[in-house]
């Protein structure tokens, strides 16, 4: 078999593509595996450390997760930690910090007490923090607006102190590590950068893939892990036409000094499909605090690569009556409508910081506009997929598998945390299609 012909070809070298590339190489008997990336290195978009909150979302402090969802997420999140320990990644790309879900006011505190009782069996390490304990581990959260006395509201939290569990990952570094480890598995593993796939077609049982610089690859099976571009490429093949996508960008603000010792999340508004504001020590900014994300719909699939992805956005959107109806129904809800408009204001010069600080003060009451600055170049784009058949937003990952042998994945947050679990699912699908084997025993002993 020549270098340009493969059993499996994975498109996209972010954390999802890298995880699948690794699992195919390590846990299957597939011999010829390719990873194709359009930029000059791995993880330049959503998996880059500046594009996400660097959090292992295991469900303990994510208040938008039900107990049932938390069980599923925990399984895949634990794989991240197991892999990191296999690679001795402690303090390299995997770190342990304090983290908590913060409740402010009597209503939220009552909710948090109930949530703690419900979740403590699944997360035995989790502890309930009263105001005094929070003051001990996160003093800025308790300090009042005047910096002289404690904030007046009733507050509590559920969380874990530093050193007990791993909480933080540089998913960009982890992507590179996964690719390096895949190339050590005695397989024909081929990695190509600066190769943008622009055309895919299936002839007989072979997929033919063409790039923008006139390269051609052939593969028996293809998995597209290209973020919002996965839907764009599917639509070009006339697949996934029952799905549309609004790209949602997230921005962050950085502090000029370290304000928080660990991750502080707020109670999620159940009406909103977006993450609640949180504060995190940033691995790439001297552990200064990063607040965010905001959420704004933008008319392009990539945020920081000019206007090239604007026409690609319209191809992925496929605007029609159903998309308009779903969007209109969202805007009919005052909570969602106000949230979306408010987040656009966070992007406007002169008013952005003062407005943002009002929200962030719920975490650090003494925070002032002069303490923060807009984190230019930070934040990624998450595809919020619309199911046209059901006429609603799809929360969580979406896959298109209608043509045998090719999978298109769109992974909004927490896609990085679920990368190894999603890779397990796709590796098994690929093996089943090709008549190959997935080594369950080896996988379970190493990652479960």
Curated annotation (Swiss-Prot):
InterPro entries: FAD/NAD-bd_sf, MQO. Keywords: FAD, Flavoprotein, Oxidoreductase, Tricarboxylic acid cycle. It catalyses: (S)-malate + a quinone = a quinol + oxaloacetate. SUPFAM superfamilies: FAD/NAD(P)-binding domain. Transmembrane segments: none annotated. Pathway: Carbohydrate metabolism; tricarboxylic acid cycle; oxaloacetate from (S)-malate (quinone route): step 1/1. The keyword Flavoprotein applies. The keyword Flavoprotein applies. Pfam families: Mqo. GO terms for biological process: tricarboxylic acid cycle. Its EC number is 1.1.5.4. Signal peptide: none annotated. Its cofactor is FAD. GO terms for cellular component: cytoplasm. The FAD is tightly bound. It comes from the Bacteria. Belongs to the MQO family. Catalyzes oxidation of malate to oxaloacetate in the citric acid cycle. Donates electrons to quinones of the electron transfer chain. HAMAP family: MQO. This is Probable malate:quinone oxidoreductase.
